[in-house]
Structure formats: C-alpha cells, structure tokens
Amino acid sequence: MEFTVSNVNLRDLARIFTNLSRIDDAVNWEINKNQIEITCLNSSRSGFSMVTLKKAFFDKYIFQPDSVLLTGLMTPTIRIRTQVKPILSVFRNKIFDFIPTVVTTNSKNGYGSESASRKDVIVENVQISISTGSECRIIFKFLCKHGVIKTYKISYEQTQTLHAVFDKSLSHNNFQINSKILKDLTEHFGQRTEELTIQPLQERVLLTSFTEEVVHNRDILKQPTQTTVSIDGKEFERVALNEGVSVTLSLREFRAAVILAEALGSSICAYYGVPGKPILLTFAKGKNSEIEAQFILATVVGSDEQEVSSMMGNRWQHSSTPASLFNSVERNNSLTAVAHNPPGSIGWQTDQSDSSRMFNSALDRSDETNGIKEPSTTNDAGQSLFLDGIPNESELAAFNNDVNDDAEFGPTQAEQSYHGIFSQED
C-alpha cells in the first residue's frame, strides 16, 4: 500500500496538518480504495473537521492493505490514529532546497529584456505507506535529487472514527465569500478571543467578539472590550440570510477553517439554521475537488435566543456567481449529503449546563453500545499522557513561516446550549 504526493501538492498537505493541529493534538486517517479522509475532533467535542484527499490528488494511489487493518464490509477501510506534532516536524525539517536561477529573455519588440526566476526543487515527491506487524508505523519517504532518500516513521494505533452528521435541509442561512476577506477580518480579533458572533443586519454581516477576562492575572483589561467588523453584502459571492438570526461559535476552530481555505485559494461556504444548531463551513480545491474540507462547529444559545425562529426578520439574498459554481461544492460534499440521521447515529442537545459532560456522555453511550471503550489520554493524576499537547500559536506561526517564507514545499497551486450529531462507523 503506497500513496505518492508530488512536490506541487506538498505545500497543501503541510497546510492541512498545520490547521488541523489547531483543533486537536491527534488526527484520524480513514483510507479506502478511492480516497483518504483525515479527521479530528476537539477536546470539548464541539468542533469536528474532515479533509478528504481524492485519488486524483496523488501521483500514485495503491490500496492493497494488510487484512489485519481492514474494517467495514461494504467498503473495506483502514482506520488509524496518529499524533499530529511528529507529522508537523517531518514537514518542518529543512529537507527541501531551492536554487534560484535568473533567466534573461531578449524582447523581440525592442522594449528591453525580461527577467524571471526559477526554483529548482530537490525533493521530487513523498511516498506514504503503512507498515504492520511488530512495527506499526506510518512511513514518509522523501525522494530527493541525486538518489537521496529521507525516511521518517511515526507510530499509529487502530481506532474507531466518529463522523459528524449535518442536516443541510434545516440550514436556511448560507453564504459564500472569498476566504481572503474573512482571513483579513479575523486578524482584528486577538489570539485569546474565544468566541465569535455572526449577525446579519441591514444587508451587512457583523462579526463581533467580546473580551472581559484579565490576561495572566494582570489588570490589562480593566474594562470589557468588544470588537466588531462589518462586511458589506456586496462582498459575498452568494448570500441568503435571515436578519435577526445570529450565531456564536468558537473563534479558534473558525479561524482554522478560514486560514486553510485561504491557503488553498478557495472560497468558503457556510450553512446554519438557528442558534444552538451546528454550523457547517466547507470548501474545495481543484477542478474535480481533489481536496475537500468540512468543519462542523457547535453554536451557543443565549438566554434571549431560546425561542428564535429560523424565519424571523427580513431575508436578503443575492448572488454574483453562477449557481452551478456554488452548487458544485454541495454535490462534492460527502459530509453534508446526509439529509437525516443514519441508523445507529446519536443526536443530542443539552440544557444550559456543562457542555463537555454532554458531549462525553453521548459518545460514551455510543461506545458502550458498540462494546468499545475509548482509550484514556490522561493518567491517574489527570495529567495528559502527551507531553507537548496541542501546538501553541507561536509554534504554528513558526511552521507557517517555514512553509510560506522559505517556500520549501515547491510551487503553490492557484450560559449556553450546544447541539451536535455524530455517527459511529462500523
């Protein structure tokens, strides 16, 4: 079993792992004969993300796994789990070298010469394989010029995967916008800001954050701080929203989705119904959507929004892009194609209490039904078994600098209630 990624796609692969690391310190791999799905679920189980790499994304895709790893009857699938930090370190190492070459071309029309730069990439591709037996490793093998091969082995464990189920038929509010615009706007919010509110108002969309905590027990913020940025309705490629329906979600996961969409050069689509129901963020890259990404995030319900209706307020909509372009993301979105809960799925909703207890208890019931006990990630003292944990913002920024500035991966191609639904795979 072997998957080969060309140097053209290495940058995208690195960015995928970088942004997934903002959500959790581990990722799940779900591999079948047609695609690889990389998923993760945050610690509070209020945010789920999945990136799908289609077969066309790879230069070579050979799916001949050891029968020990296979699960599922209809579609044989491999399900494994790896820590994300070792993967980041693989791509962060200085294993790429570029030799700039200046090419001068004399112009035929007499206007002088034109200079262009070319970069000679030493790493030609990376081969990804999975070993079984006494050494359970996922292997990254970088093939370089002059016959140099760099090999990195990362431990994995077999796992059961959870998939979020999103009912798109209940999403009366949706929009599509250039991800670069959203990324620029989210930079106005501090890194320690936890929540973001999306509110349509008079053919504009307001993004609001509210900070009232003191930083590091110092009296830096003596007064609460509210930051609001406004997006003109004309900035959207497509929009259909009900005024009066605002949703509040985690800024960290929202920012991870926006940064990844901007890095891939894709517009981002959002779908949601009412506060308390999940919001879906989705985008794709490639002519045939070789890369697809979906982020499903829980939203918060305030005390004054318990009776809100999805149809309240004025509704405004417009489109500056052909409907076929907008709908292509929907057709290629395997996650949101589920209209109703499939058999064996579990949906839940809490009262205004402890959200983490709700998510844990719901998934624990699912595991007990299937006879599966989720492995513990803490010791008896309650300390994490993973020493480093999730990368902090400075580590991620350093990695992004390696990817963007050093160009080491080759050229780039153009209180409260929560609601969530997860289905247990066979």
Swiss-Prot record:
GO BP annotations listed: cellular response to ionizing radiation; DNA repair; DNA replication checkpoint signaling; mitotic DNA damage checkpoint signaling; mitotic DNA replication checkpoint signaling; mitotic intra-S DNA damage checkpoint signaling; telomere maintenance
Span list, region Required for DNA repair function: 1-147
Domain of life assignment: Eukaryota
Taxonomy of the source species: Eukaryota, Fungi, Dikarya, Ascomycota, Taphrinomycotina
Keywords on record: DNA damage
Biological role stated in the UniProt entry: Acts in DNA repair and mutagenesis. Involved in promoting resistance to ionizing radiation and UV light, as well as regulating cell cycle progression after irradiation. Repressor of entry into mitosis that is activated by chromosome breaks.
Protein name per Swiss-Prot or TrEMBL: DNA repair protein rad9
Family as reported in the entry's similarity comment: Belongs to the rad9 family.
Gene3D superfamilies associated with the record: 3.70.10.10
GO molecular function, one term: signaling adaptor activity
Region annotation Disordered: where it falls in the sequence: 402-426
Any single GO CC term annotated in Swiss-Prot or TrEMBL for this entry: chromosome, telomeric repeat region
Matches recorded under SUPFAM superfamilies: DNA clamp
InterPro entries: DNA_clamp_sf (IPR046938), Rad9 (IPR026584), Rad9/Ddc1 (IPR007268)
One Pfam family cited in the UniProt record for this chain: Rad9
Species of origin: Schizosaccharomyces pombe (strain 972 / ATCC 24843)
